[in-house]
């Protein structure tokens, strides 16, 4: 994958996270605050816990830090997969965000 392809896929993923936060906040009382800076999104929950998602351009990966730990994802055919177990980024984000917010939330690509 070229650097440009990586950036396009990664930026689409970050935009999808922002849109999902808006949708979740409109449809529930989850109250997920999302702040985006260049190449990074910080999700802050009502209990002040956070999930941080950032781009790792040299490795062409997306990293996620949650209470459960740190996870690395690489793009494979428009899907971000965990570099260790092959799990989907958005499924994992939904799981970690649900745990940290105390209610079921779903993030989609």
Regions from the language model: what does each represent?
Residues 1-109:
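N-terminal intrinsically disordered, cationic/polar leader segments
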